[in-house]
A protein has these predicted regions:
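Bacterial N-terminal signal peptides
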Residues: 11-22
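Non-catalytic cap/lid and distal C-terminal segments of serine-dependent acyl enzymes
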Residues: 30, 36-63, 67-374
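Cleaved targeting-peptide boundary
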Residues: 24-32
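Hydrophobic alpha-helical membrane-insertion segments, chiefly the h-region
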Residues: 22-24, 167
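N-terminal secretory signal peptides that target proteins for export/translocation
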Residues: 1-7
Length: 374
């Protein structure tokens, strides 16, 4: 009978709904995690009732995690100085991100969560610049920052900083891990930095864009893409400068151009600058080196002395070198400085605590920017 069929369907629907409600009620409440507290500590939590151990990796290690009767592991960090901190969980030795913290980053092939405790490294109520992803010469992708108030149709022309990433990075490294747009917005608004265009190109010859955006089949990120230190990127760099000058209202004199990079990007910076001594007035080398050794067997980096002397003769307005005291490239960096001394190349040297880290590179950028285009 139609009435009986309707009743059966209704009973089935009620049963399914009741089961769903029971399952929802039994599901654990998602704990709050990645919470910055008033005392500058960060609260972490993850639901893992069957785990034998939960530890914290990254910048927030070591933070002791303790399991509660509700199956939630909780921990609280030490009081943190203002900065940008990354972390992840190891649940029974399996690395995983924090499911309760939506803020994630990719560094090379690794995903982590992050918390920001430094106001200068996050968005503030100030005029904001624009961040664009553009395809430059030879199909190379670049991130371009233009400052607040930028209007390509106006008569105003801007100085340009070219900012290069390290090994395993791409055009997203400085904007995301380096927090460059936030730093620029806040420092420009504070009157500490001259409004400028900042060009952050992909420096991987074999991969012209970040993973997922590279033309062709999607490729997973790798820590050392091929052909990154064989001279090709350095040789192609004048074409990037020419492209930027033809697409943006730039000032094209040497005193209005700066070039800086971290690690491999600092290595690229020095070799680009020595090959083009009249192109850049300001040069920044962050945790970098001159001789690739185990990283490359290319002959293009042999005998840099004559080109360094030509760079010295061109008298850069600033050559700024920064490195951490425990950086694994400290010895190579000292060898680079010895080559500079031998060539008569003047530089400003900054030694900091810490090693080969984004914390240092963000700090170096903040030290370098106010020195530009004065």
């Amino acid at each position: 009978m139609p009435g009986m069929q309707y009743l059966k369907k209704l009973l089935i629907a009620i049963t399914v709904a009741a089961a769903a409600c029971q399952a929802f009620a039994a599901a654990p409440k998602q704990p709050k995690s990645g919470v910055v507290n008033d005392d500058a500590t960060v609260s972490l939590a993850v639901y893992a009732p069957k785990a034998a151990s939960v530890t914290v990796g990254g910048d927030l290690a070591p933070t002791k995690m303790t399991r509660g009767a509700d199956g939630i592991w909780r921990g609280r960090t030490r009081a943190l100085r203002p900065d940008y901190y990354t972390y992840f969980f190891n649940i029974d030795d399996v690395r995983t991100i924090d499911p309760a913290n939506a803020f994630t980053e990719r560094n090379e092939m690794y995903l982590s969560n992050y918390v920001v405790t430094d106001p200068e490294l996050r968005s503030q109520d100030v005029p904001h610049g624009t961040v664009a992803k553009v395809w430059g010469p030879d199909g190379r992708r670049m991130t371009v920052y233009t400052p607040a108030g930028f209007d390509a149709r106006s008569d105003r022309r801007y100085p340009v900083l070219y900012l290069l990433h390290g090994l395993g990075g791409d055009e997203n490294a400085w904007p995301e891990l380096g927090r460059a747009p936030y730093i620029l917005d806040n420092m420009i608004a504070a009157g500490k930095v001259e409004p400028m265009i900042v060009v952050m190109p992909n420096g991987n010859i074999a991969h012209k864009a970040a993973p997922g955006d590279n033309p062709g089949a999607p490729a997973q990120p790798v820590s050392r893409p091929p052909r990154t230190m064989n001279g090709e990127f350095e040789a192609s760099f004048p074409a990037i400068v020419e492209w930027v000058d033809s697409h943006y209202p730039t000032r094209t004199d040497r005193a209005s151009r700066a070039l800086a990079g971290l690690s491999m990007g600092g290595f690229h910076t020095i070799h680009i600058a020595r090959a083009n001594p009249a192109m850049f007035g300001y040069i920044g080398s962050f945790s970098s080196f001159l001789h690739p050794r185990k990283y490359s067997d290319s002959k293009s980096y042999d005998n840099p002395g004559p080109a360094l002397r030509a760079l010295a003769d061109a008298k850069p307005l600033l050559l700024w070198v920064g490195i951490g005291k425990t950086d694994f490239l400290a010895r190579e960096n000292k060898e680079m400085l010895a080559e500079f001394d031998k060539a008569g190349l003047n530089y400003e040297y900054h030694s900091s605590e810490g090693g080969h880290t984004w914390k240092n590179w963000r700090d170096y950028l903040r030290l370098f920017l106010p020195k530009l285009f004065k």
